UniProtKB/Swiss-Prot annotation:
Belongs to the PDK/BCKDK protein kinase family. ATP binds at residues 296-303, 336, 355-356, 379-384. The lineage of its organism: Eukaryota, Fungi, Dikarya, Ascomycota, Taphrinomycotina. Its main location: mitochondrion. It comes from Schizosaccharomyces pombe (strain 972 / ATCC 24843) (Fission yeast). It is found in: Mitochondrion matrix. This is [Pyruvate dehydrogenase (acetyl-transferring)] kinase, mitochondrial. SUPFAM superfamilies: alpha-ketoacid dehydrogenase kinase, N-terminal domain, ATPase domain of HSP90 chaperone/DNA topoisomerase II/histidine kinase. It catalyses: L-seryl-[pyruvate dehydrogenase E1 alpha subunit] + ATP = O-phospho-L-seryl-[pyruvate dehydrogenase E1 alpha subunit] + ADP + H(+). The modification Phosphohistidine is found at H178. GO terms for molecular function: ATP binding; ATP hydrolysis activity; pyruvate dehydrogenase (acetyl-transferring) kinase activity.
Length: 425
């Protein structure tokens, strides 16, 4: 039996049919660089439209898992959490638009799925048939952002300001509710593997899609909450840094990784990490995403180096981080002499749950999937697949080349053009 209930399940089935709308880093920055109550209202309407669609698709993915997986306690809890969040957004009411907005900004105040949803609900509740919808005028919010209300002389009504703050509060509640979602999925997948001793390709595809969607949802939530509720910061648009210093991010990730290495192996000094990078190199990026990927790779390189050469070794070869700036990409190459990976195991490094390390428990389960984590993940097998998803989210990539018996090179590609939309499925 569905944990959602019949009515909510029908809403999921309806909303999941609508296409998702992917945004690029450039769009997010352009729209949020000079926020006004009007632009934030437009962003809120977009999220009120988009988030239920994304949540509905993930609910369906969870429901399409094998009977054993979809009946597990944590996965059922995730379905319920997503369903609750979706319904809370659906039930959020719009406001009357200010008349001072220019003609191009008179977008719909109701989501594009609202009329279809109402038609579905009327079948079960005829009393809704006379409900007035405010979606008959103008056009809906678009992601072309070229028409903004910056500079419009308008006394924004209190109802609009209240919508912005209330919606930010709701999204923050949803973000907190979903904090444990990814780790709950991971733990049930882990339990499933223990019981069946297998992770087939369909589960791999599901996890890639689920975690990529989670990155996107949390990105949209965090960006809107930051724009509405947090004081502006220099060189930031919401959570996006317009001048992310690549050297400083790598340096911070390196220090954290070395600290973890010293703790894990009881070393006085961890292997050296040499950074060859222009200290002034900057780009527009989400710093936590890059930090997550670099930290994960460096942590793996440090572990491989220490274990290959022995904890009691008098000398560890340095790990080298080389950064190159191209016309389209900034590429970060991380090279170690940690013994490499066998050719047979290369395809498996992208598989969730595959690891060459013994399990290391953490105090906080969030650390398994957190973009801000500096806690050991060795033994869970999520590190490399998640790091690759973070780099791919805005059009980059992560590649690995290994020489068994010597070491491994990992390439992190960052898209400088910032025009790639989210890879939604």
């Amino acid at each position: 039996m569905s944990v959602l209930g019949k009515t909510l399940q029908e809403k999921v089935n309806l909303l999941a049919q609508y296409p998702q709308t992917g945004l690029s880093l450039k769009q997010l920055v352009y729209f949020g660089k000079n926020p006004t109550p009007g632009t934030l209202f437009r962003a809120g309407l977009f999220l009120r439209d988009e988030l239920p669609i994304r949540l509905a698709r993930r609910i369906q993915d969870l429901q399409n898992l094998s009977p054993m997986l979809r009946s597990m306690k944590r996965i059922s809890s995730v379905k319920a959490a997503y369903g609750r969040s979706m319904e809370e957004i659906i039930e959020l009411k719009g406001v009357e638009l200010p008349k001072c907005l220019p003609k191009h900004a008179r977008y719909h105040n109701a989501p594009k799925w609202r009329s279809s949803l109402m038609d579905s609900e009327i079948l079960h509740n005829p009393s809704l048939a006379n409900t007035h919808l405010d979606s008959s005028k103008g056009r809906y919010f678009e992601t072309d952002f070229s028409d903004q209300d910056n500079g419009v002389d308008c006394n924004w009504p209190e109802s609009l300001l209240k919508f912005n703050s209330n919606f930010a509060y709701l999204l923050n509640t949803i973000r907190t509710r979903h904090d444990n979602v990814a780790v709950e999925i991971a733990l049930d997948i882990q339990e499933y593997r223990r019981k069946t001793n297998q992770i087939d390709n369909s589960i791999q595809i599901f996890l890639d899609r689920f975690y990529m969607s989670r990155i996107g949802i949390r990105m949209l939530l965090g960006q809107y909450i930051a724009l509405v509720s947090e004081p502006p910061r220099e060189n930031y648009v919401g959570v996006i840094s317009t001048r992310a210093n690549i050297y400083q991010i790598i340096e911070g990730a390196a220090e954290n990784a070395k600290y973890i290495c010293r703790l894990a192996y009881g070393l006085f000094e961890a292997p050296e990490i040499q950074i060859i990078c222009d200290p002034s190199l900057e780009m527009m990026y989400v710093e936590s995403h890059l930090n997550h990927a670099v930290f994960e790779i460096l942590k793996n390189s440090l572990r491989a180096t220490v274990e290959f050469h022995g904890v009691d070794s008098d000398f560890f070869p340095p790990i080298k981080v080389i950064v190159a700036k191209g016309q389209e990409d900034i590429t970060i190459k991380i090279s170690d002499e940690g013994g490499g990976i066998s050719r047979r195991n290369i395809p498996l490094v992208w598989s969730y749950m595959f690891t060459t390390a013994s399990p290391t428990l953490t105090d906080d389960p969030h650390d398994i999937v957190s973009a801000n984590s500096t806690t050991p993940m060795a033994g869970f097998g999520f590190g490399l697949p998640l790091a690759r998803l973070y780099t791919r989210y805005f059009g980059g990539d992560l590649e690995l080349i290994s020489m068994e018996g010597y070491g491994t090179d990992v390439y992190i590609h960052l898209n400088r053009l910032c025009e790639s939309a989210e890879p939604l499925q």
